[in-house]
């Protein structure tokens, strides 16, 4: 029994010396730092969960829009295929009904293949394209596709202008002097 008392005393002495080596203020500081880090990690986790939820919502919205635009493009392609098929069919009918006239058309030069042919002057085309780009964003409304059908389309060729022009062409200073 005496040995057990000395062992308990020896182990008690050993534990008390180990506990005396550890500073309780340092332990409390470590615990406070860990609680502070835990709070920060919880806030960060909450922010990441909110961001993830928002990202999922945006992804769903964009996926829906992408699917809608893809369907629109597929439908437009089908419509164009039908239109071109009808055009080929009409060409075939015209070739059968009026073979001489149809052959004469193919022998004459085609204006569409001529790179120098431009029905609108460059300045007007640039002005129209720039005004459309600046007033509309990436919108697929009919006003972008066909400006002539839009009520908001501004016809620049009909507007009074301070610069002299003839037949839609802007005159240079020399031409203005000769014009007067």
Swiss-Prot record:
Keywords per UniProt: Lysosome, Membrane
One biological process term in Gene Ontology: lysosome localization
Primary subcellular site in the record, as a coarse category: membrane
Database matches in Pfam families: KxDL (PF10241)
Coiled-coil boundaries: none
Stretches the record annotates as Disordered: 126-180
Claim: NADP is one of the keywords in the record: no
Polar residues composition-biased segments: 126-144, 158-170
Transmembrane regions listed in the UniProt entry: none
Subcellular location: Lysosome membrane
InterPro entries found in the cross-reference section: KXD1-like, KxDL_dom
Signal peptide annotation: none
Nucleotidyltransferase recorded as keyword: no
Gene Ontology cellular component list: BORC complex; lysosomal membrane
Subunit structure: Associates with the BLOC-1 complex.
Function of the molecule: As part of a BORC-like complex may play a role in lysosomes movement and localization at the cell periphery. Associated with the cytosolic face of lysosomes, this complex may couple lysosomes to microtubule plus-end-directed kinesin motor. May also be involved in the biogenesis of lysosome-related organelles such as melanosomes.
Family named by the database record: Belongs to the KXD1 family.
Protein name: KxDL motif-containing protein 1
Organism: Xenopus tropicalis (Western clawed frog)
Phylogenetic lineage: Eukaryota, Metazoa, Chordata, Craniata, Vertebrata
Originating gene: kxd1
């Amino acid at each position: 029994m005496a040995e057990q008392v000395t062992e308990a005393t020896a182990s008690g002495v050993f534990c008390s010396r180990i506990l005396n080596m550890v500073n309780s203020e340092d332990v409390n500081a470590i615990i406070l730092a860990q609680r502070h880090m835990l709070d920060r990690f919880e806030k960060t986790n909450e922010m990441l969960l909110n961001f993830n939820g928002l990202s999922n919502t945006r992804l769903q919205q964009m996926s829906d829009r992408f699917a809608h635009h893809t369907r629109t493009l597929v439908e437009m392609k089908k419509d164009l295929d039908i239109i071109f098929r009808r055009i080929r069919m009409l060409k075939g009918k015209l070739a059968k009904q009026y073979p001489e006239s149809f052959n004469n058309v193919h022998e004459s030069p085609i204006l569409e293949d001529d790179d120098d042919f431009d029905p609108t002057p460059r300045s007007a085309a640039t002005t129209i394209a720039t005004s459309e780009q600046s007033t509309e964003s990436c919108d697929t409304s009919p006003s972008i596709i066909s400006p002539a059908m839009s009520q908001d389309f501004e016809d620049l060729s009909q507007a009074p202008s301070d610069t002299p022009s003839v037949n839609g062409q802007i005159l240079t200073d020399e031409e203005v002097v000769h014009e007067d």
